[in-house]
Amino acid sequence: MVPQASASVGVLFVCLGNICRSPTAEGVFRAQVQAAGLSNQILVDSAGSHAYHEGESPDVRACAAALERGFDLSGQVGRQIKAIDFEHFDYVLAMDRENLHYLRKMQPSDSQSRVALFLDYAEGREGQSVPDPYFGQADGFALVIDLVESAGKGLLKQIGRNLPKIKT
């Protein structure tokens, strides 16, 4: 997805396959952005560092855990990050250190995107990774939601400081 011309800020979440963590982050953060009334200013998307699940919907367990908490992941389709994403997204946020390393190697030298760990925006979780729930149980998916809710609040606060004020 390419950011809309009207969006001031683009945020891209990245995990390994784009079926568990990053689509959950996309869905949760999109809901937070909507609740803040900033949907026309912040574009939210997700991708995988690898194309293992390109074209697939998010993991059914991720969808179920999200829906249980009031977040909708339907309509999302897995895709692999491309170099051009660094031109379109201001924040390219990794779910773990391995993906962060991959993104930093991939990032074009002239890119202005902020590449960081998503949990750097969660108070008390700086430098930590969102654990991959893929091979685990349902509680792992619930933990992912807890973590991305917290980081999303911090990220939204950070972005809000830099958004142009809307005149009403």
For the regions a language model picked out, list residue spans one by one.
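Phosphate-binding/catalytic loops
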Residues: 3, 91, 97-168
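Hydrophobic beta-strand core positions in alpha/beta domains
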Residues: 13, 93-94
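Conserved active-site segments centered on acidic
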Residues: 1-88, 157-168
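Helix N-cap/beta->alpha junction signal
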Residues: 22, 96-97
